[in-house]
Amino acid sequence: MTSKPHSDWIPYSVLDDEGRNLRQQKLDRQRALLEQKQKKKRQEPLMVQANADGRPRSRRARQSEEQAPLVESYLSSSGSTSYQVQEADSLASVQLGATRPTAPASAKRTKAAATAGGQGGAARKEKKGKHKGTSGPAALAEDKSEAQGPVQILTVGQSDHAQDAGETAAGGGERPSGQDLRATMQRKGISSSMSFDEDEEDEEENSSSSSQLNSNTRPSSATSRKSVREAASAPSPTAPEQPVDVEVQDLEEFALRPAPQGITIKCRITRDKKGMDRGMYPTYFLHLDREDGKKVFLLAGRKRKKSKTSNYLISVDPTDLSRGGDSYIGKLRSNLMGTKFTVYDNGVNPQKASSSTLESGTLRQELAAVCYETNVLGFKGPRKMSVIVPGMNMVHERVSIRPRNEHETLLARWQNKNTESIIELQNKTPVWNDDTQSYVLNFHGRVTQASVKNFQIIHGNDPDYIVMQFGRVAEDVFTMDYNYPLCALQAFAIALSSFDSKLACE
């Protein structure tokens, strides 16, 4: 088109020619049409246009195409911002940054304008208001979804059916209840990872109980940090742990057998002070707490009279606590200061054994050693104790340690830093509570009274796994719970060491 003089475009020109008037009218129409198109383009980024024809098939088209989560929400205790953007009522959700072949032409131009900066992006940010600081895929949800309930969260890696169920709930129509949606997902073989309003409190309780269940299932000695990370990343079971009653047929065999992995053996210790007025020591009885409320006797122990050091005899017969009886199963012996204890079975002392006895394999076996840190008058705070037990082999059996001299004992190996075939445990450090002005530990309701004898035994690499816990519930009643790799005899002897008086630890 050749340029014309500016005077030709003036409506009140002196030249009144029909041809030029027609050309002028055509130019005016073209200019008005061009301005209309430009105005429309400038207005399009300000509003997401809804397409009624594309809506019914948009949900089906997204099934095989969108694998990323619709909404990625990070929740914290202090609250977090949910990025929601207002849009037209007819559009359920639009994912930015994704190519959708079924979208109309106006929506394509909207996406192109959204990716570019400038006036359009600034105007949209001003209009939407809440959408800021977002990286990665985000979702534009209509105002109706906020009134219906919280945004459903789909984790990365879920199947398309689970994502389709989430999109159906977030789209138009009536939102199904949590039970119906969970049942639909279970029929399709999908584990529910969605949060429902009516199940929020139950899920928090299940997560805490499942984390405790995962922490109770530990391989062999529970000494590697890798197992801790694997247990933390493993999916938590949906059903709570069912109570399991441990069968006790042979008392001696049960007392020496390590606790099954993943099962906490809950016991109760009662102290009988009969005969103390005649110079006798109290007797301690260990019972197994069953889920039906019944109690099963396991072990009995009492301190021997006329012994140079503390010497507790342990028996499977509550009426026969003599060393020469058939029910004698082991003993606990301390040093002169009462700070170090060793647990033996009913084998023969190597210093009193003959040469034939040494070769026959009937030497006594060391089952545990307990070492209390000296703390005169309690100036160093609460008690600190270390527990050394034999390690476990590949088939979860206890390694046999039968020392023939003082250099092969558990205490000697531990003091010489020879940690081969042994496991070192320690008590969990209690936390000072300003309200009660005392040191406290979380016994999960199993201990109700404060006492210097209360303790929890853990491994240094896994402080959340409680190997054993002991505490007072009444004047002469105590609870004792133990887990793998301890056995009943080891745990009972460790508890007896806590009862004994300690000259350097009081």
Curated annotation (Swiss-Prot):
Pfam families with a match to the protein in the record: Tub, Tub_N
Ranges for region Disordered: 36-244
A GO cellular component entry from the record: cytoplasm
Keyword Transferase recorded: no
Disease as annotated in the protein's UniProt record: Retinal dystrophy and obesity: A disease characterized by obesity, night blindness, decreased visual acuity, and electrophysiological features of a rod cone dystrophy.
Biological function: Functions in signal transduction from heterotrimeric G protein-coupled receptors. Binds to membranes containing phosphatidylinositol 4,5-bisphosphate. Can bind DNA (in vitro). May contribute to the regulation of transcription in the nucleus. Could be involved in the hypothalamic regulation of body weight. Contribute to stimulation of phagocytosis of apoptotic retinal pigment epithelium (RPE) cells and macrophages.
Example GO biological process: receptor localization to non-motile cilium
Biased composition (Acidic residues): 196-206
Claim: Metal-binding is one of the keywords in the record: no
Family named by the database record: Belongs to the TUB family.
Annotated keywords: Cell membrane, Cytoplasm, Membrane, Nucleus, Obesity, Phagocytosis, Secreted, Sensory transduction
Gene3D superfamilies reported in the protein's UniProt record: Tubby Protein, Chain A
The protein's name: Tubby protein homolog
Subunit structure, interactors included: Interacts with GNAQ. Interacts with TULP1.
Biased segments, Low complexity type: 70-87, 101-116, 207-221, 230-243
Membrane topology, record value: Peripheral membrane protein
Domain of life: Eukaryota
Subcellular location: Cytoplasm; Nucleus; Secreted; Cell membrane
InterPro entries linked to this entry: Tubby-like_C (IPR025659), Tubby_C (IPR000007), Tubby_C_CS (IPR018066), Tubby_N (IPR005398)
A single MF term (Gene Ontology): protein-containing complex binding
Main location: cytoplasm
Gene field: TUB
